[in-house]
């Protein structure tokens, strides 16, 4: 396994070049340092390159980060899963919030989602670790693609390349 970067490595943004355009994500290092490090380092390693947004629910969220494309895969830089970093100041108040997808408490891996609307019922259940700072219109367009009964896009929406700034 590749080395985990030092705590001093804190790129402010991660860029997602997708098949529908570019999304720039601002990372909340102060509130969720372990989660930000995982996401930025996975991006730096090319882990997300070629992966799909495998789950899209209109007016709710777009989800990606699973190299298997099934919604059941993905690992963190720390091993399989790591603990939540829930911060009381961060709430799901609107569109463009970046958070970790999970299967319950302390089950974070590589999957993440971006909200398309307020989703207050997720407060305290998913680690918020950033926001869309450029490309929210593109995120909204991804959120409107046609999906099947399992919320999978009929036509793939891919992350062509993901990389941290700096």
Curated annotation (Swiss-Prot):
Gene3D superfamilies in alphabetical order: Cyclophilin-like (2.40.100.10)
Record-listed E.C. numbers: 5.2.1.8
A Pfam family reported for this protein in Swiss-Prot or TrEMBL: Pro_isomerase
UniProt note: phenotype after gene disruption: Mutant mice, in which PPIL1 is truncated at position 102, die before 12.5 dpc.
This protein's record includes keyword Transmembrane helix: no
InterPro entries: Cyclophilin-like_dom_sf, Cyclophilin-type_PPIase, Cyclophilin-type_PPIase_CS, Cyclophilin-type_PPIase_dom, Cyclophilin_A-like
A cellular-component GO term for this protein: nucleus
Family statement drawn from the similarity comment of this UniProt entry: Belongs to the cyclophilin-type PPIase family. PPIL1 subfamily.
Subunit structure: Identified in the spliceosome C complex. Interacts with SNW1/SKIP. Interacts with CDC40/PRP17; this interaction leads to CDC40 isomerization. Interacts with RBM22.
Protein's name according to its UniProt entry: Peptidyl-prolyl cis-trans isomerase-like 1
